[in-house]
Amino acid sequence: MNKIAELISRLCPDGVEFKTLDSLVSYVQPGPYIVSSTEYDAHYSTPVLTAGQSFILGYTNEEEGIYNASSQKPVIIFDDFTTSFHWVDFDFKVKSSALKILKIKDKQKADFRYIYMAMKTIHFIPTNHMRHWISLYSKFEIPLPPLNIQKEIVSFLDSFTSLIDKMKQEVEMRKKQMVYYIDKFYGGDFDGMMRLADIPGNSVVQFSDLGPIIRGKRFVRDDIRTVGQPCIHYGDMYTYYGTMAVTAKTFLERDFPKKMRYAHKGDVVIVGAGENDYDIGVGLVWMGEEPAAVHDACYILKHHQIPMYISYYLRSNIYHQQLKKYVSSGKISSFSAEGLGKVYIPIQPEDKQRQIASILDTFETYISKLEKMIELRQKQYEYYREKLLTFE
């Protein structure tokens, strides 16, 4: 950081010049690289990209029309409508024509990675559904210091991204380990789960045998407040909550929820509707001292087991393989309380349940700490990126 400041002071005493993006990069139309079939498979070799949030949509086995990018010849794929973009340094195909493939014009004048980072400081939000690169976005200016300063800035910022990437890789590795142990603890597969019943003290029962399965009551986003009666909305089960919650993200007015149905401390809340067949059915243990009103796209399970033992089971492949038989697929997938009640779960002695929950808690705590560290490093990266690339 000090080295960069010294270079800027010495080489740019009168400030830094600004250049338009179209003076620094050219674009290639994506037409020749559009995938013919959307029959993707993870076993295929060529990724199919979008410039949107999803980035990699899947993998194709098509051999023609592959764009050859590499660490030596990287590109930026730019969404012409949303203006989101991604750095790409591997071979790929694209999903649609609604993007541009950006390339560096002159490596002697500008570092392409620097341009990519500088583009991240352009805080433009599209308001019209139109193509933006040619008519507008390419005319935006970015600061362009001497090439050696660009490279120093890239090196400094990439040290953050490299650390963040390594931490993300560890999170993914730990999550895979956790999934492995979850399945192992509950039998490995359906037959293995059934064999657990042969162990003295164990049994395999259906969810309906655990206790009442109660559907929540309807409320909408407009009913939600920042204070009041705790409530659990089904959408937040996917985006906010984990396997357990002590406090709620949202609330209802105190006089609103007289007709609501509640999760009490130790109850398991299971989401019964979603946009895909796999995530549906995950759940959390409500551990708040105050009851939480539950949305009607969720179910409340009353039971007499170790709560986290059930919550972790809801993350197992064994559970989801059974549940999908009772899921009605459509624009929104869903299942009934009756369907959930038919799913089997291995019941082990209480001390064994506690032991399993404790081991999995250790994984989850470690993963949570890593994710918080990633968030902190990401904020540091964005702070330094803004500071360095605005030259203020």
Predicted feature residues:
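A short glycine-rich beta-alpha junction/loop motif
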Residues: 93-100, 128-146, 291-297, 328-351
